[in-house]
């Protein structure tokens, strides 16, 4: 049975292992798996985000995880807009929360786990009175998904990560997607 849960100190090690699995898989599927420095940076950033959530009890960052039994199969979080989003939008989106760390374990993809996590984060944002958020992606496979869900990005940074590797940023109204 699928369960959505908040992180705990006890689950920290398991969650970090989950990040390593999904980020490594994402890098490999994107054809950038040999870029080990960026891979490790991405994993460390997610660990830091998770620590921020646990240390602030969800005030600074707010994670949700999907579990099937005792196996973590998905993640999502929201928190302050990243420096990348602030810089690339000339601070236009600096005051919006950013939804991110949307990952589904490779063995559970295309089964609705991501949609369930999105629905839960939309509910959380609504309960907190948050009407819009931003979301960004440099991963081509994820960009296809976000384009279907949110339409064309509000910001398109061509070849931002190298030739053929764009970066996209969306500004989304919760009422438009929920």
Regions found by a protein language model. Name each.
Residues 104, 110-123, 148:
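Conserved acetyl-CoA-binding loop-helix of GNAT-fold acetyltransferases
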């Amino acid at each position: 049975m699928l369960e959505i849960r908040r992180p705990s100190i006890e689950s920290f090690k398991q969650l970090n292992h989950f990040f390593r699995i999904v980020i490594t898989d994402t890098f490999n599927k994107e054809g950038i798996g040999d870029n080990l420095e960026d891979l490790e940076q991405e994993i460390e950033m997610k660990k830091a985000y998770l620590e921020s959530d646990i240390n602030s009890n969800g005030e600074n960052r707010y994670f949700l995880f999907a579990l099937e039994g005792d196996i973590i199969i998905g993640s999502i979080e929201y928190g302050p807009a990243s420096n990348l989003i602030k810089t690339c939008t000339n601070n236009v989106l600096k005051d919006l929360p950013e939804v991110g760390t949307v990952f589904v374990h490779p063995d559970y993809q295309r089964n609705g786990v991501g949609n369930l996590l999105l629905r839960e984060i939309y509910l959380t944002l609504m309960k907190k009175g948050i009407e819009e958020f931003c979301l960004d992606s440099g991963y081509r496979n994820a960009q296809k998904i976000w384009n279907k869900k949110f339409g064309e990005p509000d910001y398109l940074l061509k070849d931002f990560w190298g030739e053929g590797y764009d970066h996209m940023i969306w500004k989304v109204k919760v009422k438009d997607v929920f």
